[in-house]
């Protein structure tokens, strides 16, 4: 079957409510729903989902940037960090994006399954730090961190999120170094970024990055207008899903006031689609990724060539790491830039 697509590539408490944030992203897995809802959408319906843009009350720190020691309240209690961290280990989704965006290259990181330790979009974004990125040590997988390998790095700060609820793991990590726990899941990417900044003592820099993101989101939204719908589709080994309101890309669309297909306007991270339901992912613009890079898993489907986005050459293959598998300011800006190029 002809592949009628275009391929786009790209190269705490002290943080107040950030009035410039839009009050409006990707869990490791989404909810499944195979009911046959209509694929039509109201062009004015953005399917907005509020993505927390400030830390929950009482979390973070009241200590000013650059001052140590500092005590940070987080999702597993509170942790005192004695000096500015220089040997950080990150163990969860979005945290590599977050620390690099704040100017810190970690000494160790966990991977998502068999994925690359440093995703391509981060290698491109932070190419000036390529030598340092190459030295990051692998410390197991996000679902099963290697505690011994972490200890051997002698870190002075460990970051993990609260989706890993093993008390014994947190206790083991806290014995190695000060450990700060973010909430996790893509929809919480903004508040988690602020919590990372609170631990590093770089809240002002984080706020400036979010202001840049908000400005870009507004600009892309104005350029896109309110009449076009935007859809995001990802195929892995055992499922194909459209990303919905409670996802990383869903939060970005809400911030940019981009309209979504009806199937994406649900309070879930994603919706599983069968081959017969692929038309529910249609929109004026379709951004898709395939695990392993074999796009025929989608483009070879019988309904693919019937999609409006495909026939009008508005179906774009994108970097899955950036769109669907990570969540942070660098990824968010990359998603917006990719959408803007497609318009």
Residue ranges and their predicted role:
Residues 1-94, 205-230, 291-295, 303, ...:
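Bacterial Sec-exported substrate-binding components of ABC uptake systems
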Residues 78, 167-236, 329-343:
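Extracytoplasmic substrate-binding proteins
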Residues 96-146:
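A short, structured surface patch at a secondary-structure boundary
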Residues 113-119, 165-168, 183-195, 231-251, ...:
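Extracytoplasmic ligand-binding site segments that recognize negatively charged/polar headgroups
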Residues 139-146, 266-274:
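Short helix-initiation/N-cap motifs at beta->coil->alpha
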Residues 154-160, 178, 283:
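Proline-aspartate-enriched helix->loop->beta-strand connector
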Residues 242-271:
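Alpha-helical, coiled-coil/dimerization segments enriched in small aliphatic residues
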Residues 281-343:
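Structured C-terminal subdomain patch of bacterial secreted/periplasmic proteins
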């Amino acid at each position: 079957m002809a592949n009628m697509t275009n391929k786009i590539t790209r190269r705490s408490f002290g943080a107040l409510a950030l009035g410039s944030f839009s009050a409006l992203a990707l869990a490791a897995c989404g909810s499944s729903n195979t009911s046959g809802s209509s694929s039509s959408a109201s062009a004015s319906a953005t399917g907005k989902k509020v993505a927390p843009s400030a830390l929950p009350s009482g979390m973070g720190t009241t200590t000013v940037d650059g001052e140590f020691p500092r005590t940070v309240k987080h999702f597993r209690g509170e942790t005192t960090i004695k000096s500015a961290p220089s040997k950080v280990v990150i163990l969860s989704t979005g945290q590599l994006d977050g620390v690099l965006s704040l100017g810190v290259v970690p000494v160790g990181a966990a991977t998502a399954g068999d994925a690359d330790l440093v995703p391509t979009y981060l290698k491109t974004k932070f190419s000036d730090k390529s030598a340092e990125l190459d030295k990051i040590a692998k410390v197991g997988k996000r679902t099963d961190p290697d505690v011994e390998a972490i200890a051997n790095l002698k870190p002075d700060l460990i970051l993990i999120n609260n989706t890993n609820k093993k008390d014994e793991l947190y206790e083991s990590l806290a014995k190695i170094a000060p450990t700060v726990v973010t909430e996790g899941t893509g929809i919480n990417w903004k508040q988690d970024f602020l919590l990372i900044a609170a631990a590093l003592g770089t809240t002002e820099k984080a706020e400036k990055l979010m202001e840049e993101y908000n400005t870009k989101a507004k600009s892309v939204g104005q350029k896109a207008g309110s009449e076009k719908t935007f859809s995001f589709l990802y195929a892995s080994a055992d499922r194909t899903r459209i990303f919905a309101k409670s996802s990383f890309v869903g939060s970005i669309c809400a911030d940019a006031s981009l309209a979504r297909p009806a199937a994406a306007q649900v309070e879930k991270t994603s919706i599983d689609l069968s081959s017969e339901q692929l038309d529910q992912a249609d929109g004026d613009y379709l951004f898709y990724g395939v695990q392993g890079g074999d796009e025929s898993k989608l483009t070879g489907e019988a309904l693919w060539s019937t999609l409006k986005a495909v026939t009008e050459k508005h179906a774009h293959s994108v970097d899955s790491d950036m769109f669907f598998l990570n969540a942070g300011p660098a990824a968010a800006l990359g998603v917006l830039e990719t959408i803007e190029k497609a318009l």
